């Protein structure tokens, strides 16, 4: 249950409320005019999907300030400072995240107020507005979620039993994929995971070549990996097989193939689930790959 902190500022104009069911605030846009803050507009993420609230106030001809972007899930909005005039108009606002502080947009004159709750983050706003922004309040939620993740399920890996076993484990989600290639197949893989609120870069599995890594970046958190398909094949001078091609499918797109399609085709997928981790076997090449999955409700 979110905690509502009452709006500060004037009492007039039209009441508005963005709601208290968002996961986080991701972007703030606003503009200051002669009389004070002319408008404000908030972007949120809710159940992994971006959501933009209506503009509060009036746009007019004033130039907007640079947007204050919050890099969710690693960054969250901690507090808001503001100032309002005797006429009940917000004169200036400053936003503070766990990583940075905005400049004061507008003026720091008038009655000062702060919207902040210890050990909580802002997930929504409410207030009042007419020709200007008259008041501003916020909804706060605990920094750590109280809803535990559903236990992950490990899917069987494909490939050969050459090399050494590796396992990154299961996380909240996958943010980036790195794939290295060699003459005989995939030389190495590396993944960047969301371990809210931190980002974790997994170890390199295999051995990268002078060609380095190719990168596949997801539009996280609204984009997630639903399946991985690929091929594995025996190579000259080895009894085992090597992963020769990998391709990553998300809820929004399919990556280009990394490597050359040759040998036995496989697919790693569980209906209604997303991939949240990887495991397999490797030495100087990638010999085997499997995944950890969680239900999409997570």
UniProtKB/Swiss-Prot annotation:
<protein>
    <recommendedName>
        <fullName>PYK10-binding protein 1</fullName>
    </recommendedName>
</protein>
<dbReference type="Pfam" id="PF01419">
    <property type="entry name" value="Jacalin"/>
</dbReference>
<keyword id="KW-0597">Phosphoprotein</keyword>
<dbReference type="GO" id="GO:0005829">
    <property type="term" value="C:cytosol"/>
</dbReference>
<dbReference type="InterPro" id="IPR001229">
    <property type="entry name" value="Jacalin-like_lectin_dom"/>
</dbReference>
<dbReference type="InterPro" id="IPR033734">
    <property type="entry name" value="Jacalin-like_lectin_dom_plant"/>
</dbReference>
<dbReference type="GO" id="GO:0030246">
    <property type="term" value="F:carbohydrate binding"/>
</dbReference>
<comment type="subunit">
    <text>Component of the PYK10 complex, at least composed of PYK10/BGLU23, BGLU21, BGLU22, JAL22, JAL23, PBP1/JAL30, PBP2/JAL31, JAL32, JAL33, JAL34, JAL35, GLL22 and GLL23.</text>
</comment>
<keyword id="KW-0430">Lectin</keyword>
<feature type="modified residue" description="Phosphoserine">
    <location>
        <position position="20"/>
    </location>
</feature>
<feature type="domain" description="Jacalin-type lectin 2">
    <location>
        <begin position="152"/>
        <end position="295"/>
    </location>
</feature>
<keyword id="KW-0963">Cytoplasm</keyword>
<dbReference type="GO" id="GO:0006457">
    <property type="term" value="P:protein folding"/>
</dbReference>
<comment type="function">
    <text>Inhibitor-type lectin that may regulate the correct polymerization of BGLU23/PYK10 upon tissue damage. Activates BGLU21, BGLU22 and BGLU23.</text>
</comment>
<dbReference type="GO" id="GO:0009506">
    <property type="term" value="C:plasmodesma"/>
</dbReference>
<dbReference type="GO" id="GO:0005507">
    <property type="term" value="F:copper ion binding"/>
</dbReference>
<dbReference type="GO" id="GO:0005634">
    <property type="term" value="C:nucleus"/>
</dbReference>
<dbReference type="GO" id="GO:0051336">
    <property type="term" value="P:regulation of hydrolase activity"/>
</dbReference>
<dbReference type="GO" id="GO:0030234">
    <property type="term" value="F:enzyme regulator activity"/>
</dbReference>
<comment type="similarity">
    <text>Belongs to the jacalin lectin family.</text>
</comment>
<dbReference type="InterPro" id="IPR036404">
    <property type="entry name" value="Jacalin-like_lectin_dom_sf"/>
</dbReference>
<keyword id="KW-0007">Acetylation</keyword>
<feature type="domain" description="Jacalin-type lectin 1">
    <location>
        <begin position="2"/>
        <end position="142"/>
    </location>
</feature>
<keyword id="KW-0677">Repeat</keyword>
<feature type="modified residue" description="N-acetylalanine">
    <location>
        <position position="2"/>
    </location>
</feature>
């Amino acid at each position: 249950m979110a905690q509502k902190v009452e709006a500060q500022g004037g009492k007039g104009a039209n009441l508005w409320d963005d709601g208290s069911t968002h996961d986080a605030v991701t972007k703030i846009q606003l503009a200051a005019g002669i009389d004070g803050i002319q408008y404000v507009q908030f972007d949120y993420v809710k159940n992994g999907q971006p959501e933009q609230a209506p503009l509060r106030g009036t746009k007019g001809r004033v130039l907007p300030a640079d947007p204050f972007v919050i890099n969710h899930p690693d960054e969250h909005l901690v507090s808001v400072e503001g100032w309002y005039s005797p006429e009940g108009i917000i004169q200036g606002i400053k936003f503070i995240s766990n990583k940075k502080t905005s400049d004061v947009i507008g003026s720091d004159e008038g009655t000062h107020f702060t919207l902040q709750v210890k050990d909580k983050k802002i997930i929504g706003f409410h207030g009042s507005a007419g020709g200007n922004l008259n008041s501003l309040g916020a909804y706060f939620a605990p920094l750590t979620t109280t809803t535990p993740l559903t236990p992950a399920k490990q899917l069987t890996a494909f490939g050969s039993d050459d090399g050494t076993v590796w396992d990154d484990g299961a996380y909240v989600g996958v943010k980036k994929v790195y794939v290295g290639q060699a003459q005989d197949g995939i030389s190495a893989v590396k993944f960047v995971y969301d371990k809210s609120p931190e980002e974790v870069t997994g170890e390199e599995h295999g051995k990268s070549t002078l060609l380095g890594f190719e990168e596949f970046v997801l539009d996280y958190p609204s984009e997630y990996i639903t399946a991985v398909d690929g091929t594995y094949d025996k190579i000259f001078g080895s009894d085992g097989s090597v992963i020769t091609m990998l391709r990553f499918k998300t809820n929004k797109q399919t990556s280009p193939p990394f490597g050359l399609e040759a040998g036995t085709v496989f697919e790693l997928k569980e209906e209604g689930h997303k991939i949240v981790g990887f495991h397999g076997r490797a030495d100087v090449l990638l010999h085997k790959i499997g995944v950890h999955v969680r239900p999409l409700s997570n």
